[in-house]
């Protein structure tokens, strides 16, 4: 019994250490990167310097896909205050984003009237993850690595990670809107 309790305590300590938020010393900032948009044109993220960003990996055939509505609503609510949503389609979670960039763009515009920027389809975790997601993990830890579609990373005006939100936290939730209000 004593052994099991100690093992459990060690496991809990390991989990908190493994998943804790890192007080990062950034070598690079969010704005020091680029990513291709849905039309395969380079987006220099430096254009968002001084803005607040919600970076979200998205998918068209996921149970969380309805969150596109909340993301668009969030974008409309805060865009005049220097806030942007950037959607990053990825097919890494259950093959739920199988379409081409053209199909993804059409899906987003037709079904959700999306007006916020969408990138081209890219990997968001693992060795082949886009450099932006590798940067996030390096500087903020494992909480930035998406576990499923519609994982959210909030970037502050300084180009640093403010917070992360799992797929179950909806875009218009108090957890997200309070953080945005705090840093805008």
Say what each PLM segment does.
Residues 49-54:
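Local sequence-structure signature of Cys/Sec-based thiol-disulfide redox active-site neighborhoods
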Residues 22-46:
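N-terminal "domain-start" segment that seeds a small globular fold
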Residues 131-134, 138-184:
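Thiol-/selenol-based redox modules, centered on thioredoxin-like
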Residues 37, 57-61:
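Amphipathic alpha-helical repeat scaffolds
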Residues 64-129:
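Structural microenvironment flanking redox-active thiols in thiol-disulfide oxidoreductases
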Residues 1-9:
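Bacterial N-terminal signal peptides that target proteins for export
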Residues 9-17:
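Bacterial N-terminal signal peptides
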């Amino acid at each position: 019994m004593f052994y099991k309790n100690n093992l459990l305590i060690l496991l809990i300590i390991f989990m908190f250490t493994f998943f804790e938020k890192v007080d990062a010393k950034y070598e690079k900032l969010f704005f020091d990167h680029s990513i291709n948009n849905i039309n395969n044109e380079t987006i220099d993220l430096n254009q968002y310097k001084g803005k607040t960003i919600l970076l979200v990996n998205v998918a068209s055939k996921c149970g969380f896909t309805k969150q596109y509505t909340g993301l668009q609503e969030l974008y409309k609510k805060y865009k005049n205050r220097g806030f942007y949503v950037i959607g990053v389609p990825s097919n890494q979670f259950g093959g739920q984003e199988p379409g081409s960039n053209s199909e993804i763009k059409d899906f987003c515009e037709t079904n959700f009237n999306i007006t916020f920027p969408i990138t081209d389809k890219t990997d968001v975790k693992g060795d082949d993850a886009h450099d932006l997601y590798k940067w996030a993990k390096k500087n903020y830890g494992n909480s930035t690595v998406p576990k499923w579609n519609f994982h959210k990373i909030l970037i502050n005006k300084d180009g640093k990670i403010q917070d992360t939100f799992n797929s179950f936290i909806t875009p218009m939730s108090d957890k997200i809107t309070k953080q945005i209000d705090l840093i805008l």
